[in-house]
Each structure stands twice: as structure tokens, then as C-alpha cells.
Amino acid sequence: MKNFKIEAVIFDMDGLIIDSEPLWKIAEIEIFKEVGFDFTVEMCAMTTGMRIDEVVGFWRKKLNWKNFTTNEIVYKIQTKMIQLIKQKGKLLPGVYSALNLLKNNNISIALASSSSMSLINTTIETLEIRSFFNIVHSAENEIAGKPNPAVFLSTAKMLEINPDKCLVLEDSKAGMNAGLNANMRTIVIPELGTSPQWAKKGFKCLRTMLEFNLDLLN
């Protein structure tokens, strides 16, 4: 079996494994409307990749909401997201083949997401990919979400692999910065059809997961 410089690949979830960013937009716009605020798609984009409690906290502070607590709004959004994932969740192109490629080459595989464990579990069970992952970890258990590197550093610790031997796959700016802040090789796969300037800070930028290959581990 070939030896690689990289010993583990850590996947983000939303927008990388599952095409969930459109679902987050639906859930956020619907629930924010319930609390009396007309939220837009452009506003959703401002907090992509952040933990949902931090998203809600950001907008509560900015817009001075007082009629619902952060926890109440978070619960409503997460409940809606679980429903949407079960109804509409699907793997993004190339994910299954990338997971198979890594597993067949004995590379450790982890998932480190800003989403809650309930959302992570719903997603990987709905998509039937749980068996691929050695470790599944949520930033809800950390002091802060991405771009703070804590979720990636904790995942590496659980894998018992040094951060510089880990490769992160991300789609968002916050996630990319979290990977870089963790001193991990970070590959960006941004939203399909986009080529944001910030993505050039990563080790490499791929158009889709279909471009993933073992050469990226050396």
C-alpha cells in the first residue's frame, strides 16, 4: 500500500458533502420571517459556514430582536432543517467516489461540521455514508465555531493524528480559515459555478469533488 504525507482527510458537511446551503436558506428565511424579520438570500450568504447559534446571535445583535431567545430560534431552524434534509437531502457529485477512494487506501476519514450532532446524524444516515467515517465531530461542542480551528484540532486529536498530517476539505471562507488556522492542508471546493478570490488562499481550489484524487495527499 502506498504511503502518503497526509494520513487523514477531514470533510466539512454543509455545501461539501450535501447540497444543504439552499436548504439552510429556506429554513433561515422561513423561521426569521416567523420572528418578524424579512431575511434575504444575500443575508444568508454573509454567515455561510458559521455555527447556527452564532448566525442567530449575529443577526439578533445587529437587528436588536427581543421577542425570541437565540435558543428558541436555533431550535426552530434546526427542526426545519432536519425535515428538509430527510425530504430533499442528496450527496454532491464526487463525494461517494472520494470516500470510497480514501477508504480503499486506508486513509482515516473524519467529518467536522459547524452543524449540530442531531443534524449531522440526520444527514449521514439519510445519505447512508456513516460507515465511512472514523470520527464525526460537531463544533457545537467547542468554545467557538469556524473560523476558529477548534473543531478541526479536536477532530485530529480524536484521530490521534498530527494536524500537519491532516487535509481539510471545505466549501466556505469560514471553514477554509479554520483549516488554515489549524495548520492543516486545506482544499476549497466552493459553490458550483463560483470561483471566489478568497478560495485562492487554500492549498488548492477544485471545481467539484469529482476532481479529488490521491495526488492531493502528497
Q: Which residues does each PLM region occupy?
A:
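Active-site neighborhood of HAD-like aspartate-dependent phosphohydrolases
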Residues: 1-45
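Short, acidic loop-to-helix structural element flanking the phosphoryl-transfer center
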Residues: 4-5, 83-111, 117, 121
